Each structure stands twice: as structure tokens, then as C-alpha cells.
């Protein structure tokens, strides 16, 4: 994907975008601790035909950069993907100011914004592939902690944007979960 570019807010070690930086340094942009500006620059690069993936902690994506995500990315329906890592309550070590549980609600309230939260590494890889092919704004929440791979045990498992997946059949109850909560629900 030569048109894919990666933006990070001085968190490449924590968000793991350091691997993209090592593989494609000419398409990696460390914007420092300036999340709102990072989203604005990504919106501009989208208008130039690039496919920007903006990476920061969920708290900063849905907090500090919310207005730019809403006005500069989602309303004009630009092809920018916002990845909020360290979402939810799994970031206890980082303190309460970094625990973001409202990011789903905030991002989903924006008209035209696709919101997703993969349950494991396998689903995340498939979700990123799907997002590269999706034309429009999207928000993907990732957790901080390592999670058990649950989708590898499902023969022919295929992630699809906008669709849920039945991971275990049953007859007495339906449990709906996303992200790292899927392994707990199973």
C-alpha cells in the first residue's frame, strides 16, 4: 500500500507504530504531542490521495482531537482512519486520566464515522486490511493488554466491516462483547 501513511503522537513505542516506522520511515510522521494538529495534517494528506492512519491513545483521539476528527475528517467524509490504543480500563498503570471508556460513544455519535474494536491480533490484522479498502472515516479502538487469540480456533474465520460474528453457538443465552472482553465472554 504505497499510499498508506502513518501518523503518531510521540507514542510509537506504546502504540507499536515503531514497526511501521522501521519498515517505511518515509511514510511515518511523528507529530509530537499535538493530536489535534496530527488529525488536521492527516485530513490534508487524505485530500492529496493518501490513506492516513492516525495513532494515539484512545483518550487523546476521542478527547484532545475530537473537534478535528468531527469537523476535518468525518463531516467531509475523508479517508482517515483514527486508531485509539490503550482504550478502556486496561491502562491502570497509566492512571485514571488515561482510562477512556467514552470513546465508543463519542466517535459513534459523529455522523458517518465507522467504529470498530477487534477482539484479538488476528481480527486486528484483518480489520486493518478491511480499513485500507474502506473509503471513509473510521475509528478503531485497541486495548493495551495482550489478549488470547480466540478467532484462530474458528475454521475460516473472516472479519467483515459492519458485521458481528458468532464465535460459539448455544441455546440458552446470547452474550455480545467487543475487544478484549470477547475472551472473557467465551
Regions found by a protein language model. Name each.
Residues 1-141, 146-147, 157-158:
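Thiamine diphosphate
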Residues 174-186:
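Glycine-rich phosphate/diphosphate-binding loop of Rossmann-like nucleotide-binding domains
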